[in-house]
């Protein structure tokens, strides 16, 4: 098996039950990479395109040394970044559900369906992340010039990073999977991050460490974003929390019921057409 295995590496063979449980951990990761890498990589490229405006706008505010300009730019750019990130999550969650279908067809349908619902979460996400980046930069910049901002601000900055990433780990899957108000999504996210604290913390640490490496490696970080960027960190994060979300909201059970109902309705329609006498 190579670094990026093909789906053939995971075909059921001798000794593998037809309805064997899904792989977990690193085995599940490589299974999805081998089977759904094309879709995740293309979704990653579109997500990078969706984030390009907000990155450029925030950087302009950074060059002006103006936090209000940075936050305002983040809010505007989040209107495009939000839908793009939502579809990155949708692509990964479909892979985790082992859902069949042509990627581009499902991507377009999901984009239209989730567009409005992802606008405000996108603004919230980009504004919060921009503020977090500013706080981290401020602390390290002061330290570089010989001034320690103090333990309370360092602790507040770290807690800010971790807590909000814990929140986002459960927020984005709900945005694309459930039709509900954002206030309820945020309430559910807080409840989930408390109820499943180890998973929420693990997902947050993955996000913080990965994007920290990307930022520290700039301008090489731009290359990392294009190749690994959103798909890698989204897949790992979703793999950690998806079991919790499915357990609480019964995602796969409800999807099966919906598809069964659609199939039953289609069959009834076909039978009705067959019973119609020809003139």
Language-model features, listed with the residues they occupy:
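Helix-coil boundary and N-terminal low-complexity module in membrane systems
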Residues: 1-137, 141-143, 150, 167-169, ...
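Alpha-helical transmembrane segments of multi-pass membrane proteins
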Residues: 152-164
């Amino acid at each position: 098996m190579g670094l990026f295995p093909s789906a053939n590496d995971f075909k059921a063979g001798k000794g593998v039950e037809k309805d064997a449980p899904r792989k977990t951990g690193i085995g599940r990761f490589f299974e999805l990479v081998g089977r759904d890498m094309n879709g995740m990589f293309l979704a990653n490229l579109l997500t990078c395109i969706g984030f390009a405006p907000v990155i450029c706008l925030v950087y302009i505010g950074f060059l002006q040394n103006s936090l209000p300009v940075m936050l305002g730019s983040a809010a505007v750019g989040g209107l495009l970044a939000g839908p793009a990130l939502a579809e990155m999550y949708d692509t990964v969650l479909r892979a985790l559900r082992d859902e069949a279908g042509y990627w581009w067809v499902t991507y377009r349908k999901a984009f239209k369906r989730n567009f409005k619902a992802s606008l405000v979460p996108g603004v919230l996400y980009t504004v919060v992340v921009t503020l977090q980046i500013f706080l981290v930069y401020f602390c390290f910049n002061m330290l570089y010039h010989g001034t320690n901002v103090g333990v309370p601000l360092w602790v507040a900055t770290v807690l800010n990073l971790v807590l909000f990433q814990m929140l986002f780990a459960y927020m984005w899957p709900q945005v694309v999977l459930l039709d509900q108000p954002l206030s309820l999504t945020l309430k559910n996210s807080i409840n989930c991050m408390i109820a499943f604290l180890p998973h929420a913390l693990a997902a947050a640490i993955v996000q913080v460490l990965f994007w920290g490496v990307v930022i520290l490696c700039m301008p090489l970080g731009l290359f990392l974003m294009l190749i690994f960027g959103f798909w890698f960190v989204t897949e790992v994060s979703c793999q950690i929390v998806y079991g919790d979300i499915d357990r609480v909201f019964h995602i796969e059970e409800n999807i099966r019921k919906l598809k069964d109902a659609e199939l039953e309705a289609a069959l009834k329609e076909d039978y009705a057409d067959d019973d119609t006498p020809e003139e």
